[in-house]
């Protein structure tokens, strides 16, 4: 309460002389007022972004710690498995590229494969009659 009372006393002491002053008015040009408004707005945005970065930095650091724990490799894992997995992935990639290339060229045997795998309706009918 003492600080509030002290602020009120200072306000009354400082405001009365300010109102009594009679100086010539010095107005800023309109473009300078606009420039000051834009600079003030950008400064406020900068402060808000800075506060946001500081506020959210702790949560981000905790997330990074969790990911490092998850990313630690198993020391007892067999390295040959990794090599095998890489080789299989490479083979799949080559196979996929080859399929893309044949699809572009129009040399696909997908229709023949389907006919060989699934017997037609007339073949099913023949097998059921016999």
UniProtKB/Swiss-Prot annotation:
Membrane topology value: Single-pass membrane protein
Keyword Glycoprotein set for record: no
Biased composition (Basic and acidic residues): 80-107, 117-130
Region (Disordered): 62-130
Main location: membrane
Entry keyword set: Membrane, Signal, Transmembrane, Transmembrane helix
InterPro entries documented for this protein: PDZK1IP1/SMIM24
Intracellular or extracellular location(s): Membrane
Signal peptide segment: 1-20
Cellular compartments per GO CC: membrane
Keyword Transmembrane: yes
Transmembrane segments: 31-51
Record-stated family: Belongs to the PDZK1-interacting protein 1/SMIM24 family.
Protein name: Small integral membrane protein 24
Encoding gene per record: SMIM24
């Amino acid at each position: 309460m003492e600080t509030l009372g002290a602020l009120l006393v200072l306000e009354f002491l400082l405001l009365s002389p300010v109102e009594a002053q009679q100086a010539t008015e010095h107005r800023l040009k309109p473009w300078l007022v606009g420039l000051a408004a834009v600079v003030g707005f950008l400064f406020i945005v900068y402060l808000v972004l800075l506060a946001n970065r500081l506020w959210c930095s702790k949560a981000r650091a905790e997330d990074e710690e969790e990911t490092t724990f998850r990313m630690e490799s198993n020391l007892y894992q067999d390295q040959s498995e990794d090599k095998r997995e890489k080789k299989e992935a490479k083979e799949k990639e080559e196979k996929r590229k080859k399929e893309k290339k044949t699809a572009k060229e129009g040399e696909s045997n997908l229709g023949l494969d389907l006919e060989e795998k699934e017997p037609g309706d007339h073949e099913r009918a023949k097998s059921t009659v016999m």
